[in-house]
């Protein structure tokens, strides 16, 4: 619920419709209201990625990311041929798609389209990691997610802000060396 609220607050898409959700609330009279509807928002939840092996886990990740790209299909019109190929490799779930950097690439595409930095919301970031630990493919999963999250949140010049939720302490997992905000 909190992540949805953040999405509705910041998302540049449907900003006028979303503004109505905050009418009559304290934030409506706050200086923060000037930020409402100002950013493209990438919202991804990993709550349903609970697979028994890495192959199935990665298949579900590809489907999830493809669906995310599908929701931003309109940005394709602003991409050059090389960028379009990168977008389409994910969109069509090709094996050669750069899934480790998919969120960072999507943030680049959105930044290019909207000419403003992007907010990334990741809900239940740790569900696939817990499942991987329980089912014996932790090393493969942690290797993927370390890059997936770091490229999106740590080394991303197109990022305005990122928010993650989960039950594991990020510092304990060692997923983000040097990412402590």
Predicted regions and their residues:
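Phosphate-binding site recognition
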Residues: 1-181
């Amino acid at each position: 619920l909190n992540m949805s609220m953040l999405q509705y607050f910041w998302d540049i898409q449907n900003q006028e419709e979303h503004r109505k959700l905050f009418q009559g609330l304290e934030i409506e009279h706050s200086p923060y209201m000037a930020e409402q509807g100002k950013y493209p928002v990438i919202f991804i939840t990993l709550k349903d990625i609970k697979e028994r092996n890495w192959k199935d886990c990665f298949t579900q990740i590809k489907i999830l990311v493809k669906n995310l790209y599908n929701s931003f299909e309109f940005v394709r019109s602003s991409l050059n041929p090389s960028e379009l190929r990168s977008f389409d490799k994910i969109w069509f779930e090709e094996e050669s798609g750069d899934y480790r950097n998919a969120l960072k690439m999507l943030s680049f595409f959105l930044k290019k389209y909207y000419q403003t930095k992007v907010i990334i919301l990741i809900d239940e970031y740790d569900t696939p990691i817990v499942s991987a630990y329980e089912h014996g493919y932790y090393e493969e999963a942690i290797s993927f997610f370390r890059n997936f999250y770091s490229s999106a949140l740590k080394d991303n010049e197109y990022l305005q802000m990122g928010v993650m939720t989960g039950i594991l302490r990020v510092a304990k997992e060692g997923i983000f060396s040097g990412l402590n905000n």
